[in-house]
Amino acid sequence: MEKLTTLTGVGVPLRRSNVDTDQIIPAVFLKRVTKSGFDDALFYAWRRDPNFVLNKPEYAGKGQILVAGPEFGIGSSREHAVWALHDYGFRVVIAPSFADIFYGNTAKNGVLAAIMPQESVELLWKLLEEEPGREMTVSLETRTVTCGDVTLPFEVNDYVRWRLMNGYDDIDLTLQHEDDIAAYEKMRAEKFPFKPKTIPAKHWAEERIESAREPEDADWTGPLADRGII
């Protein structure tokens, strides 16, 4: 995973609160099993509106820092929401608050979820809207956001900050213990050389299954038989 320490890029003001994961990426796009190719699906319904912020020439395909309202990422726990943001180009999302599961998914996929007071977010919205296409700088080292002459602090979990600055995803963290894992697997193979076995289904004797529709007396007739049901 690519390291993230300092990022300078175009800030996008998204004046919306309670943005849920279905608005970030509709469920119809969740059938894909790769983490790429979701950029066109990001905010799919909203982007049908020609006046949506990402359709404006100052932001289209250029945004790297998204500034949104509170409770960003609520709803179902689809990791695709973060994949779509990252695939579009966003490495940072700034908001007063985030849904817990969404917040956890951001760190695993190289996206910073920076928590900032509502008044600070509103100030950033004002600055970005005054000069569309304006660049901002986000520093994980100092935990600050700079936009023009304004520098504001943000909150980030220490563990999340450490992961992002080192570029560690879950696989990277696991590989740090590769020697211990290999030693355990070697010990396990030596101590428990056998492997559990199951009898394949084809070795079982065939057994006829009685149909629930077959009457015990083949000569029996009745209302159902008269109607041709049995």
From Swiss-Prot:
GO-annotated cellular components: 3-isopropylmalate dehydratase complex
Entry's EC annotation: 4.2.1.33
EC top class named in words: lyase
A molecular function GO annotation: 3-isopropylmalate dehydratase activity
This protein's UniProt keywords: Amino-acid biosynthesis, Branched-chain amino acid biosynthesis, Leucine biosynthesis, Lyase
Pathway assignment: Amino-acid biosynthesis; L-leucine biosynthesis; L-leucine from 3-methyl-2-oxobutanoate: step 2/4
Signal peptide residue numbers: none
CDD domains: IPMI_Swivel
InterPro entries documented for this protein: 3-IsopropMal_deHydase_ssu, Aconitase/3IPM_dehydase_swvl, AconitaseA/IPMdHydase_ssu_swvl, IPMI_Swivel, LeuD
Record text on subunit structure and interactions: Heterodimer of LeuC and LeuD.
Family classification: Belongs to the LeuD family. LeuD type 1 subfamily.
Protein name per the record: 3-isopropylmalate dehydratase small subunit
Taxonomic source organism: Bifidobacterium longum (strain NCC 2705)
